[in-house]
Amino acid sequence: MRVEICIAKEKITKMPNGAVDALKEELTRRISKRYDDVEVIVKATSNDGLSVTRTADKDSAKTFVQETLKDTWESADEWFVR
């Protein structure tokens, strides 16, 4: 499965150093518990977005990734060490 998370450039510039890499690592760890062969890409773009590809169950996978992203973002104080 390939997960591509697009974060608006103006938001990325406000994130602490290392936050993008830490987010990628944490999402990979969490999503890998349910799906094998996960590739997570976090990149700066003009708009926020999420795409999930290379999986047979796209709808349920995207729902799972959206929930996981939300939980991960909301619990950043627990896993992100500056």
From Swiss-Prot:
UniProt keyword list: DNA damage, DNA repair
Q: In its keyword annotation, does this UniProt entry include DNA repair?
A: yes
Kindly indicate whether the keyword Secreted belongs to this entry: no
Q: Which Gene3D superfamilies match?
A: DinI-like (3.30.910.10)
Q: Name one GO biological process term.
A: SOS response
Q: Which Pfam families match?
A: DinI
What family classification does the UniProt entry report for this protein?
Belongs to the DinI family.
Q: Which PANTHER family would you find in this protein's record?
A: DNA DAMAGE-INDUCIBLE PROTEIN I, DNA DAMAGE-INDUCIBLE PROTEIN I-RELATED
Q: What's the protein name?
A: DinI-like protein Z3305/ECs2939 in prophage CP-933V
**What organism, scientifically named, is this protein from?**
Escherichia coli O157:H7
